[in-house]
Amino acid sequence: MDFMNENQAAHGDREYGHMVTRMGIERKVVVGHWSDENVQNRIGSWMRTAIGIIESSHIRVMRVADNMRNVAVTEGDKVEAQLKFGWEVDAYPVNEIAACVDAVTEPDINALVDEYYDKYEILLEGRDAGEFKKHVAVQAQIEIGFERFLKEKNYHAIVTHFGDLGCLKQLPGLAIQRLMEKGYGFGA
């Protein structure tokens, strides 16, 4: 029976290949025995690409503010992104997101700052340690506020720019790097 199943799979694979060729559908074809490491690597590469395409088809992008004034390359084409890739790109006033940042509590900020200091080597050469820690706390507050906003609105990526900080006290540098580490997409 196993031998027959193998032959049936081969027959079905050929039938499928013939059908999609007639339909003009481009596809990836990997040939070889499943146990061959090269075949496994090629199939694995294809699978990762397929996952990326599927995941990309329903991305929701949050723009902090909208376009940077007088800088054409920041425009992008939100409609084309929706049509071509299926991405939803929404812009929010920076102060609406800043309100979410301002709502972060001191204990939450302190806990994340402690995590930063445990996880990263903080170089303080020539800097006042207490003053520097205050700046780090601002990044922690931004990270928490942005992440809460992203989760609440079900966004997968964020776009920021330095042309409009609104009520934010700093550019979201470390905060954005940490969001990327957590799997959020980022563009500027």
Regions found by a protein language model. Name each.
Residues M1-A188:
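An N-terminal assembly and electron-transfer interface module characteristic of large anaerobic redox
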